[in-house]
């Protein structure tokens, strides 16, 4: 990995759970860190002032995070406060700076998961041309528990196609950087036409 690590934040404590991971990747690979936050404008004249304030807040927020992370990354720390659709702007920024990885926080699969996962994280993994690392922080008593990265093993899911194998080089590089074990997994499914009560696996 040669490009910087892009970490996508939305200003919440939850999203900042991705920061320790982004910083650790930055240090392990000796690359820079790019802090990105996107203000999504409301397209009506009534919200013109609100949009301007949201943009100013986003700029101040990115500047503060960059300052707070000073000296903690493996290279130069940069930041970008963007305006527009979050997924599109993050993907554009990643391409512009040649990002090696996009790191972001995501909820789990609870009843509200799609509210965030569907709008940003899911969009990133569907459209980004670089690896996307999604961090799921623990929540206890409505508090976000930020945990430091502890990578002992990396699992790569394969399906026998070249598309799935595209993850191998990235996974191997991460395994070397973290001195972690690398596991390859492929699940073989039985065709429905060979299902039989005499074959327990079907």
Regions found by a protein language model. Name each.
Residues 19, 51-64:
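Short, surface-exposed alpha-helical segments at coil->helix boundaries
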Residues 72-78:
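A short helix-to-beta-strand connector/capping loop
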Residues 1-4, 19, 24-28, 91-143:
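Gly/Ser-rich helix-loop-strand patches that form or flank binding pockets
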Residues 1-52, 149-201:
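Small/aliphatic-rich secondary-structure junction motif
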Residues 145-147:
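Active-site-proximal loop->helix
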Residues 81-89:
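Charged docking surfaces used in two-component/phosphorelay signaling
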Residues 35, 78-81, 134, 184:
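A structural preference for short, hydrophobic beta-strand core positions in alpha/beta folds
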Residues 42-45, 89, 111, 142, ...:
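Generic structural signal for helix capping and beta-alpha/helix-loop junctions
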């Amino acid at each position: 990995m040669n490009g910087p690590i892009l970490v996508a934040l939305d200003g919440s404590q939850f999203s900042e759970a991705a920061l320790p991971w982004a910083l650790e990747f930055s240090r392990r690979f000796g690359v820079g860190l790019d802090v990105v936050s996107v203000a999504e404008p409301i397209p009506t004249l009534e919200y013109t002032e609100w949009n301007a304030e949201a943009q100013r807040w986003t700029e101040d927020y990115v500047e503060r995070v960059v300052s707070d992370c000073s000296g903690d990354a493996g290279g130069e720390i940069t930041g970008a406060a963007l305006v527009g659709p979050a997924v599109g702007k993050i993907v554009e920024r990643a391409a512009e700076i040649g990002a090696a990885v996009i790191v972001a926080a995501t909820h789990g699969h609870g009843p509200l998961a799609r509210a965030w996962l569907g709008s940003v994280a899911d969009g990133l993994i569907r459209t980004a041309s670089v690896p996307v690392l999604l961090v799921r922080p623990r929540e206890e008593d409505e508090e976000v528990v930020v945990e430091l990265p502890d990578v002992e093993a990396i699992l790569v899911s394969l399906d026998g196609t070249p598309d799935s194998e595209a993850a191998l080089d990235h996974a191997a590089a991460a395994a070397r950087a973290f001195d972690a074990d690398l596991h390859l997994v492929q699940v073989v499914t039985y065709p429905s036409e060979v299902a039989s009560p005499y074959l327990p696996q079907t």
